[in-house]
Amino acid sequence: SGDTFTIPSGATITNSGTATGFGGGKVAQYVAATPTIGETSTTSGTLVVGGGGINLTITPSSSSNKILIAFHCLLAAQEDNGVFVDIQRAISGGATTDGIFNAESGSASQGAGGFGSAANSGTWYGMVGQFFVDSPSTTSAITYKPMFARWFGSGTVYMGNNASICSGYALELET
């Protein structure tokens, strides 16, 4: 304890025991979704899957690992309307959860981000990044999809359009 060892570049270290105390945080795998182009619209305050059909599937190597999910999609809200985003999680052979951010936070209408447009201001557009660290406790394949809903107002909100790409990726993080 307290000793310092200098290891030259290119050296190989062989351990005959158990290496401990190094902590987690290593990226076990990276998965990118195939970017999609497409528009989904809704007038509902209930979450719907959007993003032009984009989905992100990852199979964790350990049930104790966490998954960092990120989606980047264009949102639009007609004047005097708001839009918020969340993520759907579907575990192969298990449950599908709409709005995993809402489910964890206990909020029914906040989601993982969004924006609102002012009255008499036309349609507002914004590229919104969704980030969530999930603890799915499984080694089954998990499919994540971006979701969105109208936050306030009575008009139409959109995710994606015919000229913008929705993209996403996931990182499995060892704990």
Indicate residue ranges for each PLM-predicted region:
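Glycine-rich, low-complexity segments
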Residues: 2-39, 175
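Intrinsically disordered, low-complexity, compositionally biased regions/tails
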Residues: 6, 14, 21, 25-27, ...
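Terminal beta-strand-rich extracellular "head" domains
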Residues: 42-43, 59-141, 145-175
